[in-house]
């Protein structure tokens, strides 16, 4: 399989950035295919920390081509700010090594404002969005009124498209008792940014098709996690896009046959940001300790993550919905030193045992985890780079996870550093 798709197998924040960066050394092209700048990730390379939100991890690798696909919602100002920050850290970013789908949907300030207004008005019913305009931008895309990157190249037709967009948004704003938006200001702002954005514009589906036919290795970089998928996640506490592996095809314009190997990333425990069901959540001192050790705070938002034991039911479900061939297990070192660890092997729902997470919101809130206790390990796993360096009990824990989710571990990460990775099976050679 020449191409690899990386997806989160939990609720996001699984450590995809490090794994993608590690794999990108073997790839020619790294592609983002969904989401926006709401899903940040941190990379530590030679002691230098890089925080990415919108840009593919491939930008940190010289000689690699980074691509933002049509499935992404693209905030022009966030993009320019992120590029400037990374360039200040010595990262070279230009149209030579970064291409953006010309048909990508733009996130505008009005999307961010609407996102925040809705979330604040919802109060106790808030979903927990990042308030960065992701959902409203996807709404406009589906509603066929979005402004796309290619529209900035035609200033004759852009005003008409802005008016069509505002016919919807100004009606919403009147209902929310907010002032209407001036079309002229949006036109002026987009016109000013156009010269800085259009040099990156590309017919991405065509570019990737050419590269694939040339035999180039393509790495598809997913954002967030499969349990936040708008269809297969814990709805309505989900994101506004499809985050499962199949989106790699539609989010780039490539056919399903181009996808190849699917690598699912999951932590050795479970975390979640924001509201929504979390069967194995630990609201005690153990949960606090896991969060402290794992530095479980959002890269972009700084929000504290909820922590819990590994949920094999959920990861097994994700293996099925994403067609995952192998797992990359991260943050095993965070569990070092515990006398024992728990793994969720099933649920009880209204007194009945089940082996999946039901789709209904009420049922998801009522499921109770069934745990299996596994002996812990005292020896450190941190910075291990081979199986021989791992404690025997830690290996047993990994093997039990494989059995429970029905999928082999292909990679094991033992620290944020790129080199602290144990390779079991190379996804590009599987």
Swiss-Prot record:
Top-level enzyme category: ligase
Keyword field = Cytoplasm, GTP-binding, Ligase, Magnesium, Metal-binding, Nucleotide-binding, Purine biosynthesis
So what EC number does this one have?
Answer: 6.3.4.4
Active-site annotation: 13, 41
Cofactor binding: number and manner: Binds 1 Mg(2+) ion per subunit.
Q: Which residues bind substrate?
A: 299-305
InterPro entries under this entry?
Adenylosuccin_syn_GTP-bd, Adenylosuccin_syn_Lys_AS, Adenylosuccinate_synth_dom1, Adenylosuccinate_synth_dom2, Adenylosuccinate_synth_dom3, Adenylosuccinate_synthetase, P-loop_NTPase
Q: Which Gene Ontology biological process is one annotated for this entry?
A: 'de novo' AMP biosynthetic process
Which Gene Ontology terms cover its molecular function? Answer: adenylosuccinate synthase activity; GTP binding; magnesium ion binding
Which residues are recorded as binding Mg(2+)?
A: 13, 40
Q: Which positions does UniProt annotate for GTP binding?
A: 12-18, 40-42, 305, 331-333, 413-415
- Entry-linked SMART domains: Adenylsucc_synt
Question: Required co-factor?
Answer: Mg(2+)
**According to its UniProt record, which reaction does this protein catalyse?**
IMP + L-aspartate + GTP = N(6)-(1,2-dicarboxyethyl)-AMP + GDP + phosphate + 2 H(+)
Q: Where in the cell is it found?
A: Cytoplasm
Q: In which pathway does it act?
A: Purine metabolism; AMP biosynthesis via de novo pathway; AMP from IMP: step 1/2
One GO cellular component this record assigns the protein to is: cytoplasm
One Pfam family from the UniProt entry?
Adenylsucc_synt
Per UniProt, where does IMP bind? 13-16, 38-41, 130, 144, 224, 239, 303
Q: Which family does it belong to?
A: Belongs to the adenylosuccinate synthetase family.
Instruction: Fill in the subunit field for this protein.
Output: Homodimer.
PANTHER family xrefs: ADENYLOSUCCINATE SYNTHETASE (PTHR11846:SF0)
Q: What does this protein do?
A: Plays an important role in the de novo pathway of purine nucleotide biosynthesis. Catalyzes the first committed step in the biosynthesis of AMP from IMP.
State the protein's name: Adenylosuccinate synthetase
Organism equals: Rhodopseudomonas palustris (strain ATCC BAA-98 / CGA009)
